[in-house]
Curated annotation (Swiss-Prot):
This is Triosephosphate isomerase. Involved in the gluconeogenesis. Catalyzes stereospecifically the conversion of dihydroxyacetone phosphate (DHAP) to D-glyceraldehyde-3-phosphate (G3P). It is found in: Cytoplasm. Belongs to the triosephosphate isomerase family. The active site is at H103, E175. It catalyses: D-glyceraldehyde 3-phosphate = dihydroxyacetone phosphate. Keywords: Cytoplasm, Gluconeogenesis, Glycolysis, Isomerase. One of its GO terms (biological process) is gluconeogenesis. One of its GO terms (molecular function) is triose-phosphate isomerase activity. Pathway: Carbohydrate biosynthesis; gluconeogenesis; Carbohydrate degradation; glycolysis; D-glyceraldehyde 3-phosphate from glycerone phosphate: step 1/1. It comes from Shewanella baltica (strain OS155 / ATCC BAA-1091).
């Protein structure tokens, strides 16, 4: 069985401030001297430099830990007349190691199709970033028992465009749309069922990838339900939304992941 290091990735969405970043580091910089879990901070792009500076300033306090920086989105294009967009190279230059791709809010609010998501996945890897690929079903799809079908379609398009081995340098986040920002989380059993399906799906084309890829759960994760979720055999941590904005809650989630 592969030893997959748990990950807790905090997606601030369009929230936070430079002051929040300082508060987070003040809270956990000296308490994360442990590399048993990886912590990724994904602030809005405007605050990436603030977080980068805090990582550097707290380098000694964070010694022995794995705290990284990630972005919430990137353009599928390398450069050009794309007002408001940020390229993979720009994110790499900013110090990012990870980037969230295909979040349900991007798909739903900004019309990102699975083809665009696959292109962004490729753009991330082209510039040395590790994509955190989000997949998940809507409430109606779950009620219609189409969860596996929807997720398979979302995975397959990325595989078709990028190849299976592209997942050797990728993270997957299962985020059921009916749980994102609703306060209603999937049960540990529901999460495990879907994570096991994703792992099996990838194992069919590459046993190595299937066994080693990290699969995060995202959708109303809190300190009260994280231990049970992270204890599932195919759940390798969480993509955290609201709780990542609360320094105490986020530290609790990191601590839970470190003992999972």
């Amino acid at each position: 069985m592969a030893l997959r290091r748990p990950m807790v990735a905090g997606n601030w969405k369009m929230n936070g401030s430079a002051a929040l970043a300082q508060e987070l580091f003040k809270k956990f910089a000296s308490k994360l001297q442990n590399d048993s879990a990886e912590v990724v901070l994904c602030p809005p792009s405007i605050y990436l430099e603030s977080v980068r500076q805090l990582l550097e300033a707290n380098k000694e306090a964070l010694d022995g830990s794995l705290v990284r920086m990630g972005a919430q989105n990137l353009s599928q294009h390398d450069f050009g007349a794309y007002t408001g967009e940020v390229s993979g190279q720009m994110l790499k230059d900013s110090g990012c190691r990870y980037v969230i791709i295909g979040h349900s809010e991007r798909r739903r609010m900004y019309g990102e199709t699975s083809n665009i998501v696959a292109e962004k996945f490729a753009a991330a890897q082209k510039h040395g970033l590790t994509p955190i690929l989000c997949v998940g079903e809507s409430g109606p799809a779950r009620e219609a028992r189409r969860t596996f079908e929807v997720i398979a379609e979302e995975l397959d398009i990325v595989i078709q465009k990028n190849g299976t081995m592209a997942f050797d340098n990728a993270i997957i986040a299962y985020e059921p749309l009916w749980a994102v920002g609703t306060g209603k989380s999937a049960t540990p059993e529901q999460a495990q069922e879907v994570h096991a399906f994703i792992r099996k799906r990838l194992s069919e084309v590459s046993p190595f990838i299937g066994e080693n890829i990290r699969i995060l759960y995202g959708g109303s994760v809190t300190p009260s339900n994280a231990a049970d979720l992270f204890a599932q055999p195919d759940v390798d941590g969480g993509l955290i939304g609201g709780a990542s904005l609360n320094s105490s809650e986020f530290l609790s989630l990191c601590t839970i992941a470190m003992s999972a």
